UniProtKB/Swiss-Prot annotation:
This is rRNA-processing protein CGR1. It comes from Saccharomyces cerevisiae (strain ATCC 204508 / S288c) (Baker's yeast). It holds the Pfam family Cgr1. Induction: In response to cytotoxic stress but not genotoxic stress. GO terms for cellular component: nucleolus; nucleus; preribosome, large subunit precursor. Signal peptide: none annotated. It is found in: Nucleus, Nucleolus. Its main location: nucleus. The lineage of its organism: Eukaryota, Fungi, Dikarya, Ascomycota, Saccharomycotina. InterPro entries: Cgr1-like. The keyword Nucleotide-binding does not apply.
Length: 120
């Protein structure tokens, strides 16, 4: 803008470039300012909320079931291991009755070594 003296002057903030100061200044539209507080939910929002609650409930149930199943499987594996150890000890006792103790001990060590190699 150029004033009467011929000097160029920078437009003040808030005034339009055209210089038409009689027009109202507009503020930018902000969606958050238009939200109505305490409004009732629409049927779609209710359905969405119910769906979310159902999903969370099912996830909790699934987590509980998984935890229960893990405990059950741990118990089963523990029982299997115990039975295997017991069976192995009984077998060694039967062998010890037939053979010399040192020979049985050597056999036991050899079998453990073979088992360790096999598991690699």
């Amino acid at each position: 803008m150029v004033n009467e003296t011929g000097e160029s002057q920078k437009a003040a903030k808030g005034t339009p470039v055209s210089g038409k100061v009689w027009k109202a200044e507009k503020t930018p539209l902000r969606a958050k300012s238009r939200v109505v507080k305490n409004k009732k939910l629409t049927s779609w929002e209710l359905k969405k909320q119910k769906r979310l609650e159902d999903k969370q409930f099912k996830e909790r149930l699934k987590a509980l079931k998984d935890e229960k199943e893990e405990a059950r499987q741990a118990k089963i594996t523990m029982l299997k291991e115990r039975r295997e150890k017991k069976e192995e000890n009984e077998r060694y006792e039967r062998l010890a009755a037939k053979m010399h103790a040192k020979k049985v001990e050597r056999m036991r060590r050899r079998e453990k070594r073979n088992k360790a190699l096999k598991e690699r």
